[in-house]
């Protein structure tokens, strides 16, 4: 590769906003405007196609690089409590999520890092909420 050559960024998928079945396949940490965690999920859209989407949340790390338990009001804490109800937040092993099937609320990511609306051509789908398949208590299921 020549010096100064740009590597193209893969386009992020976009599907209709709604609730879909998904399966968590992996997770990873990433630093961009603060430390983030990505819960990577295979979502099955209305046509039966498998789309790779992520649940993205901010996290805090100790000096040793370990995740600090999220606040109870955070979207990460709510997701972990719903998917791993018998595990204390301080004891969460994110590897326990891998292989879990869940319901995923998918919405368009419309804002940039400055909270300004991006041009529509730059919108992409992201998972905003995740719940167990068998759990029908959540309001968002009635939105569609």
What are these regions (language model features)?
Residues 1-144:
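Short beta-rich binding modules
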């Amino acid at each position: 590769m020549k010096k100064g050559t740009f590597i193209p960024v893969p386009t992020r998928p976009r599907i209709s906003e709604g609730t879909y079945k998904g399966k968590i396949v992996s997770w990873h940490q990433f630093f961009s405007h603060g430390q983030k965690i990505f819960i990577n999920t295979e979502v099955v859209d209305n046509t039966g196609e498998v789309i790779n989407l992520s649940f993205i949340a901010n996290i805090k790390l100790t000096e040793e690089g370990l995740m600090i338990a999220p606040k109870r009001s955070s979207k990460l804490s709510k997701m972990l409590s719903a998917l791993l109800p018998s595990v204390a937040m301080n004891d969460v092993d994110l590897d326990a999520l891998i292989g879990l099937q869940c319901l995923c609320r998918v919405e368009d990511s419309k804002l940039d890092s400055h909270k300004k609306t991006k041009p529509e051509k730059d919108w992409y789908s992201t998972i905003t909420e995740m719940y167990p398949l068998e759990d029908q208590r959540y309001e968002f299921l009635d939105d569609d």
